[in-house]
């Protein structure tokens, strides 16, 4: 039978519940348990797919094509289990499901209410996501005291009661702020947060106390006394320079022991050697590179969370410190791309909409003409294709119908029929809903032999997608005639998946790659990702070559 660990948060949001839950999951997995994580989001949106990155941050895509909370990216980076659609659900999905059942008459004429119908539906979703695992960690979004979170907390309380003794544990993450004026840590917000949780009927088995410094024993004892949590279960979680130190921090204070005792589990001892090695590699780099990332959401770097982590993973596996500087594509559009000359490599990530796109096109051209390693992801590939079509292939009016619906040369266009990750044929048009109408999830395609992509991936590539627009095959042949290499295509529709510049000949470039998919979703600190590792190696080579020029 699956055991449950519910992770809640108090005082303020953005304390790091996802990192805490993923770190505990990593420890439990190292103890031989089969572990998964679920994220319960209280917002009414069906999923985050149509939410602004400034509102929500990154949308993480699972292998089976779900658009989910960015915390699922943390989950996959900390444990080996892959997340699925069932690992993330929202208030919107719950109400949508309950209303469908009511319309079908499944409630037999009863008055449909939050209790029991909504809370029962939440429990059903939790059990569905946890099926087949020894332990499921369930992160409840929001903050205790929020109206939106109440049905989820009530469902967790009911599930714990129904599942019986030793079937569920509650871990509460809270803030212990340091007041400079008083010169001390303040425990009162934590006391009130636990009190609020207990009013709901939930008594935490462990407290994770976030602070900017380790919490002294006397303060932990005070928190224990007023929150009715054993002192050894009051865990100090202070600011760390890398999230990959958190598993060791929690293990050193016995959080996994407390949880296992509560759940009556006796697994093997933990082995955190993989995290020790990762942290050592992060703290002892032999090289350094600086990447210029040209995007439109640069004021909120959470929008590129998986991407920045993938670059850091590549740094771990190349013994390099990867410095990332975020550049607003609108500023490049206004002042020109000359500021990019100082970078060891340039990356243009995915995105949507017309704003700042000409700055991204200028960045792609600057990288091509100055032999700077270039990596274009999703939209980053499309702008590189547009740039090459305009300035090399003679298609001077080339554009995407996303930015100019009436463009005379739509080298990038909306695809209206495609095969999804499960083989199902999907269709859409300009009038389709925005939500859930993209090419989503993992797909596999063959890689053209003799290309840079083949050196990186081998014979085939399987990656995750999230986009509506594709390279237009009507123009792709002309661009290929001008020297661009299409090194991978989808098997069913022959859509461009990878494009690159040749490394020899008239249009030679040392490393210039665009991909239609999102490889960052498959990167982990344990293994890195071959494409990002190759990119960082190219950045190192470019940096070395530029330094050699200065010497001579």
From Swiss-Prot:
Domain Glutamine amidotransferase type-1 stretches: 290-545
Pathway: Pyrimidine metabolism; CTP biosynthesis via de novo pathway; CTP from UDP: step 2/2
Taxonomic superkingdom: Bacteria
Binding site for CTP: 13, 146-148, 186-191, 222
Gene Ontology molecular function: ATP binding; CTP synthase activity; glutaminase activity; identical protein binding; metal ion binding
Gene Ontology terms: cellular component: cytosol
Additional remark text: CTPSs have evolved a hybrid strategy for distinguishing between UTP and CTP. The overlapping regions of the product feedback inhibitory and substrate sites recognize a common feature in both compounds, the triphosphate moiety. To differentiate isosteric substrate and product pyrimidine rings, an additional pocket far from the expected kinase/ligase catalytic site, specifically recognizes the cytosine and ribose portions of the product inhibitor.
Family to which the UniProt record says this protein belongs: Belongs to the CTP synthase family.
NCBIfam families (alphabetical): PRK05380.1, PyrG
Name listed for the protein in its UniProt record: CTP synthase
Classification lineage: Bacteria, Pseudomonadati, Pseudomonadota, Betaproteobacteria, Burkholderiales
